Amino acid sequence: RGICSEPKVVGPCTAYFRRFYFDSETGKCTPFIYGGCEGNGNNFETLRACRAICRA
């Protein structure tokens, strides 16, 4: 569950992927745009995956 407390990382690349991260302040999985590189573990392809891992 450590990845769920990691910050959202958009990354320096310029791709446009809609992903989800767990926002530890709100306790919810939230969409964001991921650039495609240099992210972290708090980066999920689907809302369902985010909720399953982080129990949101």
Curated annotation (Swiss-Prot):
<dbReference type="InterPro" id="IPR020901">
    <property type="entry name" value="Prtase_inh_Kunz-CS"/>
</dbReference>
<dbReference type="InterPro" id="IPR036880">
    <property type="entry name" value="Kunitz_BPTI_sf"/>
</dbReference>
<feature type="disulfide bond">
    <location>
        <begin position="4"/>
        <end position="54"/>
    </location>
</feature>
<protein>
    <recommendedName>
        <fullName>PI-stichotoxin-Hcr2h</fullName>
    </recommendedName>
</protein>
<keyword id="KW-0646">Protease inhibitor</keyword>
<dbReference type="GO" id="GO:0005615">
    <property type="term" value="C:extracellular space"/>
</dbReference>
<feature type="domain" description="BPTI/Kunitz inhibitor">
    <location>
        <begin position="4"/>
        <end position="54"/>
    </location>
</feature>
<keyword id="KW-0872">Ion channel impairing toxin</keyword>
<feature type="disulfide bond">
    <location>
        <begin position="29"/>
        <end position="50"/>
    </location>
</feature>
<keyword id="KW-0722">Serine protease inhibitor</keyword>
<dbReference type="GO" id="GO:0004867">
    <property type="term" value="F:serine-type endopeptidase inhibitor activity"/>
</dbReference>
<comment type="function">
    <text>This protease inhibitor shows two different activities. Almost completely (95%) inhibits TRPV1 (IC(50)=6.9 uM), the capsaicin receptor, a non-selective cation channel expressed by sensory neurons of the pain pathway. The toxin also shows a weak inhibition of trypsin and chymotrypsin activity (Ki=0.2 uM and Ki=0.7 uM, respectively). Shows analgesic effect on mammals. In vitro, it shows cytoprotective activity in the oxidative stress agent 6-hydroxydopamine (6-OHDA)-induced neurotoxicity model.</text>
</comment>
<keyword id="KW-0800">Toxin</keyword>
<dbReference type="GO" id="GO:0090729">
    <property type="term" value="F:toxin activity"/>
</dbReference>
<feature type="disulfide bond">
    <location>
        <begin position="13"/>
        <end position="37"/>
    </location>
</feature>
<keyword id="KW-0166">Nematocyst</keyword>
<comment type="similarity">
    <text>Belongs to the venom Kunitz-type family. Sea anemone type 2 potassium channel toxin subfamily.</text>
</comment>
<dbReference type="Pfam" id="PF00014">
    <property type="entry name" value="Kunitz_BPTI"/>
</dbReference>
<dbReference type="GO" id="GO:0099106">
    <property type="term" value="F:ion channel regulator activity"/>
</dbReference>
<dbReference type="InterPro" id="IPR050098">
    <property type="entry name" value="TFPI/VKTCI-like"/>
</dbReference>
<keyword id="KW-1015">Disulfide bond</keyword>
<feature type="site" description="Reactive bond for trypsin">
    <location>
        <begin position="14"/>
        <end position="15"/>
    </location>
</feature>
<keyword id="KW-0964">Secreted</keyword>
<dbReference type="GO" id="GO:0042151">
    <property type="term" value="C:nematocyst"/>
</dbReference>
<dbReference type="InterPro" id="IPR002223">
    <property type="entry name" value="Kunitz_BPTI"/>
</dbReference>
